[in-house]
């Protein structure tokens, strides 16, 4: 009897201990999404591969979305791991997997279709959906004009949702959703006449239109919309709250505006003629001098594509050009600058490139140490064009106006004032055609963007071999004569 009682007591104690252990285990909270990210030390992000979001060039990863999400990862104190999706359905499917990425940063617009899959952040970029057609073809001016047209959009996109709504009022409207294309492909198909129309957001068109000079905006479809990041619908609020706090802070401290200026502040500087001409020269002229740009790049430690962009802005890659003011050669050097840089023959393209690169680096090295990249490069370009003294005057004006004298976004607003007496009379170096360096920098940035895109590793060598397809250039059409400078 005693033994039986003791056995029952031991069992009771064992059951009590087991129950207590299970209860305590249940009380241990599961780490939040944000805590898991910090514990792992990695922020896994999924995006799209395009000029407006994310791509890789010779210097590594770049793109508007990449730059912004990299800053977020840095704020968290973790590494950034980028994954790309072939289409939007795959992107949202991967986002919802327990072992998948925790954040989607891909120029997304919130929609009812995605409501069950994701929750969206505060906005960070305002865009306008636009109907795109090919120049020379019938231009629709409203939704009714879409009926009877061959239209393709990204599968699962907000643009597909828009067309679905329009179809309710316009039953004859037909369109195709494709998961085998990206925005660049859709614009190319319009440019080449494979489809009549597509829908893209204004920022994507701005980044890509220079590659497709025949595409035009038919009309804006609806109001402006906000692009947002997304997290999985089933996740807790921890990461989303941190994202919103970061985006709000980035809006207030100017980070978002600086990124917008860096990627979109100069994209509209090329019109149709400029885009078409540059596309031609990219194939016909650049291959002759690319080796000189690359060789000089190694010596002076400056990106060869930036040197090429400067050269194009200066002479359109024409080595024997001479201006009315006496500057000559591919990099348009003055006699004085050429002598200082050791250039004996300004019409020799190799010497001209070497001299121009050396001078650019001299100017850049003379800038105040407080000016950091990427602004330092834009400041150096402005000084290369207008002179360091006038640039310093513009920085002084910026400071007087309560702006940041170390940010190109602010200083470029002041440069045009150097041509106005009420302003230049108060400066050390006086009058300057201050608008010129603003355009000079904007043009070079645009050329540089294009060169960066077309010289991605997967396209390497195609420019030099003449095999690179530059949209808008008909290879069977004789090259038009460029205007002499």
Curated annotation (Swiss-Prot):
The active site annotation covers: 314
Q: Give the GO terms filed under biological process for this record.
A: cell wall macromolecule catabolic process; cell wall organization; peptidoglycan catabolic process
For this protein, the record's CDD domains field holds: MLTF-like (cd13403), PBP2_YfhD_N (cd01009)
Q: How does it sit in the membrane?
A: Peripheral membrane protein
Record localization = Cell outer membrane
Stretch forming the signal peptide: 1-27
Positions of region (LT domain): 268-485
The residue stretches assigned to a coiled coil in this entry are none
Q: Where is this region: Non-LT domain?
A: 28-267
Q: List the disulfide bonds.
A: none
Under the heading PANTHER family, the entry gives: MEMBRANE-BOUND LYTIC MUREIN TRANSGLYCOSYLASE F
The entry's function note states: Murein-degrading enzyme that degrades murein glycan strands and insoluble, high-molecular weight murein sacculi, with the concomitant formation of a 1,6-anhydromuramoyl product. Lytic transglycosylases (LTs) play an integral role in the metabolism of the peptidoglycan (PG) sacculus. Their lytic action creates space within the PG sacculus to allow for its expansion as well as for the insertion of various structures such as secretion systems and flagella.
What protein is this chain from?
Membrane-bound lytic murein transglycosylase F
């Amino acid at each position: 009897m005693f033994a039986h009682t003791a056995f029952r007591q031991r069992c009771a104690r064992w059951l009590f201990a087991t129950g207590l252990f299970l209860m305590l285990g249940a009380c241990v909270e599961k780490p939040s999404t944000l805590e898991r990210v910090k514990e792992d030390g990695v922020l896994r992000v999924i995006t799209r591969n395009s000029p407006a979001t994310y791509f890789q060039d010779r210097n590594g990863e770049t793109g508007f979305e990449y730059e912004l999400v990299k800053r977020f990862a840095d704020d968290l104190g973790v590494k950034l791991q980028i994954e790309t999706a072939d289409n939007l359905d795959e992107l949202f499917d991967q986002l919802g997997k327990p072992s998948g990425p925790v954040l989607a940063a891909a120029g997304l617009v919130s929609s009812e279709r995605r409501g069950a899959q994701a929750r969206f952040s505060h906005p960070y970029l305002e865009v306008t959906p636009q109907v795109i057609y090919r120049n020379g073809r019938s231009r629709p001016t409203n939704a009714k004009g879409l009926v009877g047209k061959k239209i393709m959009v990204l599968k699962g996109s907000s643009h597909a949702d828009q067309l679905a709504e329009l179809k309710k009022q316009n039953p004859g409207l037909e369109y195709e959703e494709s998961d085998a294309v990206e925005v660049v492909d859709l614009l190319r198909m319009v440019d080449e006449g494979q489809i009549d129309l597509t829908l893209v957001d204004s920022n994507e068109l701005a980044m890509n239109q220079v590659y497709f000079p025949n595409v035009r905006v038919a009309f804006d479809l609806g109001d402006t919309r906000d692009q947002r990041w997304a997290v999985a619908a089933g996740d807790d609020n921890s990461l989303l709250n941190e994202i919103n706090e970061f985006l709000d802070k980035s809006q207030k401290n100017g980070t978002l505006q600086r990124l917008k200026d860096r990627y979109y502040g100069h994209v509209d500087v090329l019109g149709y003629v400029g885009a078409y001409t540059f596309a031609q020269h990219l194939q016909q002229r650049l291959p002759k001098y690319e080796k000189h740009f690359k060789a000089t790049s190694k010596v002076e430690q400056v990106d060869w594509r930036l040197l090429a962009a400067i050269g194009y802005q200066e002479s359109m890659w024409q080595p024997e050009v001479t201006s009315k003011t006496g500057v000559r050669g591919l990099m348009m050097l003055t006699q004085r600058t050429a002598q200082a840089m050791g250039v004996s023959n300004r019409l020799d393209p190799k010497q001209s490139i070497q001299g121009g690169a050396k001078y650019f680096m001299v100017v850049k090295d003379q800038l105040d140490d407080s000016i950091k990249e990427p602004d330092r490069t834009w400041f150096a370009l402005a000084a290369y064009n207008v002179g360091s003294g006038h640039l310093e005057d513009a920085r002084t004006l910026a400071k007087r106006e309560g702006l940041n004298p170390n940010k190109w976004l602010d200083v470029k607003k002041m440069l045009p004032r150097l041509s106005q007496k009420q302003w230049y009379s108060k400066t050390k170096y006086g009058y300057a055609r201050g608008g010129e360096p603003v355009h000079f920098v904007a043009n070079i940035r645009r050329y540089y963007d294009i060169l960066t895109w077309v010289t991605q590793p997967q396209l390497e060598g195609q420019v030099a071999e003449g095999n690179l397809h530059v949209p808008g250039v008909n290879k069977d059409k004789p090259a038009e004569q460029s205007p002499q400078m």
